[in-house]
């Protein structure tokens, strides 16, 4: 975090506190989603809601939001139109009509956002599209998302001059091998980006994890961040945005704030149904700068017939990264891992190691394996480390 702070320190002073907004990316408005909107309205300044999506083949899908739930939350709403960065044919006229159509369905919108992760070489064409789109918005503010890789282009400044504001994405930008979020790299991206824009900008930060699946030859098969693990590759790993690392990054931004930085946009609003996102309590803790922490506990639980379940417990009110290793007591003769854990070969004492282990939710107990140990074996185990986010 020292490198992050150093990189950001050169960017400016310390104006008013950063505001916190959230993306609502869920397609279905479930009771859990409505509950999350209501529960977080006290610290969320605005909602950015997925309103439409243009897929790779050009088809546009429009999503229906719960306007009642949004109105009850009493915060500004910004509909987002997502355009697939791999779009085969960019029909500017048709897309412009779709964006204007979305805006007519959101008459009270505080702005409209275009989320288009286009290749850097297409920035001039994208700028031309935005230049023609803006007059059609009738005075509604225009926001766009941006990628750190664009900072190396001479065309970026012209693009950013068109939009009223932008949102820089600093999560899940690199290859999956690099993880979801690296604070030092993100800080360097923010520092570079701030030199290209003279309009307000925000930073998109993650509240989620991803499961990455690989083929036998080591090539990437799938990255699953919003759905259950469906891909069946030869191997898989769980990536996790550490709440502690993200909170420290935000605190660094607040202490050494780049000029023009208006706030944070969190991707995405956590709900109890979202098994790949932080809990609401964890997200609130990161935003407020106070994470409730307590050491994880491990123990054996009698499972009958001489076997025991290996349990890991999180007594804290916020999520915790799963331990990277769980060492069983000396004398245990057989063991194996479950739910993302496996038995490390040739270890004494027998040790379970994490491969795909998911974060441990607040106040949760999870079985991570089983063991056969002699009667009277101590039930307290040894755990260490956390996976790298």
Task: Describe every region a protein language model picked out.
Residues 47, 114, 166, 203, ...:
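Conserved, mostly hydrophobic/aromatic
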């Amino acid at each position: 975090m020292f490198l992050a702070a150093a990189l950001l320190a050169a960017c400016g002073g310390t104006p008013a506190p950063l505001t916190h907004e959230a993306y609502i990316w869920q397609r279905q408005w479930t009771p859990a989603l409505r509950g999350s909107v209501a529960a977080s309205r006290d610290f969320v300044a605005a909602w950015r809601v997925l309103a439409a999506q243009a897929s790779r083949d050009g088809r546009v899908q429009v999503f229906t939001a719960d306007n009642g739930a949004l109105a009850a939350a009493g915060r500004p709403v910004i509909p987002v139109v997502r355009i697939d960065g791999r779009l085969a044919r960019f029909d500017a006229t048709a897309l412009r009509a779709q964006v204007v159509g979305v805006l007519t369905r959101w008459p009270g919108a505080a702005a409209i956002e275009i989320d288009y992760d286009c290749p850097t070489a297409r920035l001039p064409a994208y700028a031309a599209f935005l230049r023609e789109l803006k007059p059609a918005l009738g005075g509604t503010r225009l926001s766009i998302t941006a990628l750190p890789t664009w900072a190396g282009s001479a065309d970026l400044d012209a693009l950013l001059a068109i939009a009223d504001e932008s949102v820089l994405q600093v999560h899940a930008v690199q290859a999956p091998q690099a993880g979801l979020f690296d604070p030092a790299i993100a800080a360097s991206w923010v520092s570079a980006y701030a030199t290209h824009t003279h309009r307000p900008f925000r930073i998109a930060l993650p509240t989620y994890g991803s499961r990455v699946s690989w083929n036998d030859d080591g090539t990437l098969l799938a990255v699953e961040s919003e759905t259950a693990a469906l891909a069946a590759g030869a191997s898989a790993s769980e990536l996790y945005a550490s709440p502690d690392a993200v909170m420290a990054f935000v605190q660094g931004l607040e202490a050494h704030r780049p000029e023009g930085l208006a706030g944070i946009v969190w991707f995405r609003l956590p709900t109890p149904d979202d098994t790949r996102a932080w809990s609401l309590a964890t997200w609130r803790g990161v935003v407020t700068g106070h994470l409730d922490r307590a050491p994880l506990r491990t123990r054996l639980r009698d499972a009958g017939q001489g076997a025991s379940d290996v349990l890991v417990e999180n007594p804290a009110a916020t999520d915790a990264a799963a331990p990277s290793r769980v060492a069983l007591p000396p004398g245990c003769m057989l063991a194996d891992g479950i739910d993302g854990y496996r038995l490390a070969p040739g270890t004494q004492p027998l040790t379970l190691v994490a491969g795909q282990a998911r974060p441990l939710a607040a106040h949760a107990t999870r079985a991570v394996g089983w063991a056969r140990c002699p009667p009277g074996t101590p039930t307290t185990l040894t755990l260490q480390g956390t996976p790298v986010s």
